[in-house]
Design a protein with these regions (language model features):
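Acidic, aromatic-enriched beta-alpha/helix-loop junctions
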Residues: 81-124
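Short, compact, well-ordered microdomains
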Residues: 111-155
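Charged, low-complexity intrinsically disordered segments and flexible loops
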Residues: 55-58, 66-67, 72-74, 80-89, ...
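Conserved small/polar residues in nucleotide/adenosyl-binding loops
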Residues: 159-160
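A short beta-strand micro-motif
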Residues: 4-10
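Basic/aromatic-rich interaction segments and small domains that mediate binding to polyanionic partners
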Residues: 23-31, 81
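Short beta-strand-centered aromatic/proline hotspots
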Residues: 15-17
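Short, mixed-charge low-complexity intrinsically disordered segments
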Residues: 31-43
Length: 160
C-alpha cells in the first residue's frame, strides 16, 4: 500500500506527515502525532504546482530533485529541467546507519558545491543547525530540511 503524505500546520509550524490508523504522524519524528479531535491542527494544501519550479544556480535555471541514498537518508540534487540530466548533488551522505523515517537533517556538500548552503537557505529549503561533521579535511554543515517544502516541490520523490 502506497503511503499518503499530507502537510499539517500546528502551532504555526508545518510538518510532513503520513496518515495511518486514524492518526497523522511526522515522518521525521514518528513519536510526534496529530489526532483529529484531540489536537488543534490543520491539513494544508500541498500546493503541488511547484513541481516544475526552477532555481537559479551557477547562472543556470535548474530543477531541485529530492531523492534518497541507499540507506534512506535524503539526497538533494539539481538537474537540467528539459533533459533531466543531473547537474550536481547538493548533499553528502555521511551516515553509517539506515535512516529512521524520513530524516529532516542532511549534510551539505560544501566541498564540491561551496554555494550549496547559501542556496538551500535562500530558498527556504533548509536552515543551518550549527553542527558540523568532519570527513577527511572538510567540515560539512548539517541542515534541518524543510520537508513540507521539499514535498511540495516533488511529491513523486516520496513514493519510494
Amino acid at each position: 500500500m502506497e503511503k499518503k503524505y499530507v502537510i499539517i500546520l500546528s502551532e504555526g509550524k508545518e510538518y510532513l506527515c503520513c496518515h495511518e490508523d486514524g492518526c497523522y504522524y511526522d515522518v521525521s519524528c514518528p513519536m510526534r502525532s496529530f489526532t483529529e479531535g484531540e489536537e488543534d491542527f490543520e491539513i494544508m494544501d500541498s500546493g503541488q504546482n511547484r513541481h516544475g519550479k526552477t532555481y537559479p544556480y551557477h547562472k543556470r535555471k535548474l530543477k531541485l530533485v529530492p531523492g534518497f541514498y541507499p540507506n534512506g537518508w535524503l539526497a538533494l540534487s539539481l538537474e537540467v529541467p528539459k533533459t533531466g540530466e543531473a547537474y550536481t548533488v547538493l548533499t553528502v551522505n555521511l551516515e553509517d546507519f539506515p535512516a529512521f523515517g524520513i530524516p529532516d537533517k542532511a549534510f551539505v556538500d560544501i566541498n564540491n558545491n561551496p554555494e550549496a548552503m547559501d542556496f538551500l537557505i535562500r530558498y527556504n529549503l533548509a536552515e543551518d543547525t550549527g553542527y558540523r561533521r568532519r570527513n577527511g579535511c572538510v567540515e560539512y554543515p548539517m541542515v534541518k530540511l524543510n520537508l513540507p517544502e521539499l514535498y511540495r516541490i516533488s511529491p513523486v520523490s516520496y513514493t519510494h
